Amino acid sequence: MKMKIIVLFLYYCYIGSTSSVLASIDNVNELSVLLSVKSTLVDPLNFLKDWKLSDTSDHCNWTGVRCNSNGNVEKLDLAGMNLTGKISDSISQLSSLVSFNISCNGFESLLPKSIPPLKSIDISQNSFSGSLFLFSNESLGLVHLNASGNNLSGNLTEDLGNLVSLEVLDLRGNFFQGSLPSSFKNLQKLRFLGLSGNNLTGELPSVLGQLPSLETAILGYNEFKGPIPPEFGNINSLKYLDLAIGKLSGEIPSELGKLKSLETLLLYENNFTGTIPREIGSITTLKVLDFSDNALTGEIPMEITKLKNLQLLNLMRNKLSGSIPPAISSLAQLQVLELWNNTLSGELPSDLGKNSPLQWLDVSSNSFSGEIPSTLCNKGNLTKLILFNNTFTGQIPATLSTCQSLVRVRMQNNLLNGSIPIGFGKLEKLQRLELAGNRLSGGIPGDISDSVSLSFIDFSRNQIRSSLPSTILSIHNLQAFLVADNFISGEVPDQFQDCPSLSNLDLSSNTLTGTIPSSIASCEKLVSLNLRNNNLTGEIPRQITTMSALAVLDLSNNSLTGVLPESIGTSPALELLNVSYNKLTGPVPINGFLKTINPDDLRGNSGLCGGVLPPCSKFQRATSSHSSLHGKRIVAGWLIGIASVLALGILTIVTRTLYKKWYSNGFCGDETASKGEWPWRLMAFHRLGFTASDILACIKESNMIGMGATGIVYKAEMSRSSTVLAVKKLWRSAADIEDGTTGDFVGEVNLLGKLRHRNIVRLLGFLYNDKNMMIVYEFMLNGNLGDAIHGKNAAGRLLVDWVSRYNIALGVAHGLAYLHHDCHPPVIHRDIKSNNILLDANLDARIADFGLARMMARKKETVSMVAGSYGYIAPEYGYTLKVDEKIDIYSYGVVLLELLTGRRPLEPEFGESVDIVEWVRRKIRDNISLEEALDPNVGNCRYVQEEMLLVLQIALLCTTKLPKDRPSMRDVISMLGEAKPRRKSNSNEENTSRSLAEKHSSVFSTSPVNGLL
């Protein structure tokens, strides 16, 4: 009966098309249907504002609506509009509809079962759950189905095999399980098959080898096991095969060598064994070959050198042996060669890099020997040279010290000798120079002090014999300088007045003499200072006790004299102090962490006493008093301490009485207490001048300053310590409480509380009980970056110049680089956006809101749901649900575009289904001047626009579609260094433009990326 009704309906629609009157009636009906569809949608950004009745209403011109020549709706494209709600059943009345796209929204409700026959359905990047809807005979004409990036589950049914017209099937990033249906063999027209990022199991079906039209097969990030079917070698049209990250095993079939069109082959992170098939060398079209993270054995086959189009070869983390085929240096397109963590031996090909645009060479943790080839940077593209943990001998090639593209040089733990070549300090992109654990001699080249880019220098465990260059510690970007275990002599340079970035200084185990310069206290970012095992004399400068970031101070095994500074125990951040085996005297202060310091960290000082050491004798006290005025202060301190204890006891009694009175009438009233929400526990990550009670007193509606996806934020003013805090009370569902997840969450927050970086909002503490959780962190005076850019707070008036915005971009990059590269395990934020970047009183950027962050103990980790914010989410996040640092880098790129354009990630002006990334890329494709995209409030003159365009290129690199093509955050920092604003007078503007134009292409030399689009 239903089929008859549909047939009659279609028949009358056809007859009606011959009559203008009936056509008009039909259009009115479709208009009503569209309004009915709109009525069940939630449209917070008002994208569908033109969907309304008016005297001139023509629904064919409405946003997202396309009609055929008869005036009937044939396409609905509502992608990227932030829509929620449900799709009305009335959509079934759009009988001419053939294409339906609601991707990148927030829909959760299932589609109506009465959806009309379609050729294209795109419901990707939503929150649909449940099983994939069943297909009726009316769906047999379906050509394009994209349901990626949802929460769909269940098994893939045999019904999918009935869609014989299907060309694109994209189900990536869901929770499908079970094995692949054998009916897939019926999909003879299928060109694209995307199933990655699910929980599919079983073996790969050999019937996939019967799909003659298949060009792209993305099946990785699943639980497939067993071997690769040799029948896969029959898919002659296959260009892209991704079977990465699974449980596949056995040998790689030699039949893959028959895939004459294949360009990308990804088999990394499986359990493949055996040797690399020599037949792989027959795939002359191959550009990307990644067999990393398996258990492959044997040698690298000589046939690999026949892959003349090969750009990337990654065989790292296997069990390969033997040497590198010498002819690999003849591959004219090779950009990336990663072989680290194998058992390879022999020498590197002597002309490696001579014929290829080599950008990235990593052969670390092998058994390579011989000399380092001098040709590695012949083409001028080498950015990363990583050779550590081998047995390379000879000298460091002088050609490397003139390689202007270098960003990282890591050669530690080899047998290199000779001196450090002069010239590394002149490489404007070089960030890391790691030469530790070799046999290098001579001195530290003086040009190192002139570097404008070096952030990490490690010359430890060598045989360097010289004094330190006087300005070595004043390198502007220097964060770590490590020269331990050498023969460095002379005094510690007294040139600390300009060390804005230095956080780690290790001069231990040398022969340094003289005193510790008091000017070292000017290094505001210094976290670790290690001067142990030297010949230092004099007293410990009391200025050290005021250093706001210093957490580790090791002065052991020297000849320091005098007393411990009284305030050293209450130093703002100090957590570890070792002054053992010196000549210190006098009582040990009993304040701060010195009350519980390990006595071993004080031993070897015969004159020290008191505190955690044995009590001071009268003789020691007299000696101490005679030798300095500190004795009087200590006696006064004891008297004041006794008085303070008495006063504190009285104050405690009074406070408890007053608090009980407040507690019965304030925030935590009797009702709350009766529900078990007491006691509150305060976990402190820093020394705090307030209590849980102080915080709770501020949690009231009048102090609320924000509300987000993770909780409510309150401003809390601590009158006792004149401190202003931000307190986030986290949302918690009843299920969370019943599941008892508090302990896990506390553990995670405890890890995050240990983060220390100037561009990360400091977590000061964590307040919790059985029902509620609150995170306490620094209050940022200038709010968040999103409001500043888009004009919602006063800080926006301070961001009208490019230098301020650039500095914010650089600060965020440093913060993310710390999370990704310096934390162990690394921290993936997962929700980088302008609203999660806070601005302090100096407009320095601080990354905030780790409500979605996860500590990544492994390189890849599955998450239970898509997190992040629309407009900032990386495209692969919807189909892999496996997160790594690349999703943060994409989001960072979007933030860069916000800073550059002054626009939000999603704006109606961009067009339907277009975000800011695509909006900019379209301008490039359409040859539209990119200056038009820049914020006119900032880029109002030519040289500023040129500087901004350099950063725009970095933003485009960060937002490339493929995660592997995105740079790391360390690369981003290097590129931003190239794009640093250079202010010149108007008379020099022409020269400025020319110099920037020359740098325009070099920005990309720090990342192996071929293009922007």
UniProtKB/Swiss-Prot annotation:
Location of the region described as Disordered in the Swiss-Prot/TrEMBL record: 976-1013
Residues bound to ATP: 705-713, 728
InterPro entries: Kinase-like_dom_sf, Leu-rich_rpt, Leu-rich_rpt_typical-subtyp, LRR_dom_sf, LRR_N_plant-typ, Plant_LRR-RLKs, Prot_kinase_dom, Protein_kinase_ATP_BS
Compositional bias ranges of the Polar residues kind: 1002-1013
Membrane topology, Extracellular segments: 24-633
Limits of the Protein kinase domain: 699-983
Substrates-to-products reaction catalysed: L-seryl-[protein] + ATP = O-phospho-L-seryl-[protein] + ADP + H(+); L-threonyl-[protein] + ATP = O-phospho-L-threonyl-[protein] + ADP + H(+)
Domain of life: Eukaryota
Compartment(s) where it occurs, according to its Swiss-Prot or TrEMBL record: Cell membrane
Keywords: ATP-binding, Cell membrane, Developmental protein, Differentiation, Glycoprotein, Kinase, Leucine-rich repeat, Membrane, Nucleotide-binding, Phosphoprotein, Receptor, Repeat, Serine/threonine-protein kinase, Signal, Transferase, Transmembrane, Transmembrane helix
The protein's Enzyme Commission number: 2.7.11.1
TM region(s), chain numbering: 634-654
Statement: the UniProt record of this protein carries the keyword Hydrolase: no
Modification sites for Phosphoserine: 864
Signal peptide stretch: 1-23
Observed effect of gene inactivation: Reduced procambial cells number, and adjacent or interspersed xylem and phloem formation.
Function: Involved in the regulation of procambium maintenance and polarity during vascular-tissue development. Involved in the pollen tube perception of the female signal. Phosphorylates MDSI1.
Record family assignment: Belongs to the protein kinase superfamily. Ser/Thr protein kinase family.
PANTHER family assigned: LRR RECEPTOR-LIKE SERINE/THREONINE-PROTEIN KINASE-RELATED, MDIS1-INTERACTING RECEPTOR LIKE KINASE 1
Quaternary context: Homodimer. Interacts with MDIS1 and LURE1.2.
Official protein name in the record: MDIS1-interacting receptor like kinase 1
UniProt organism field: Arabidopsis thaliana
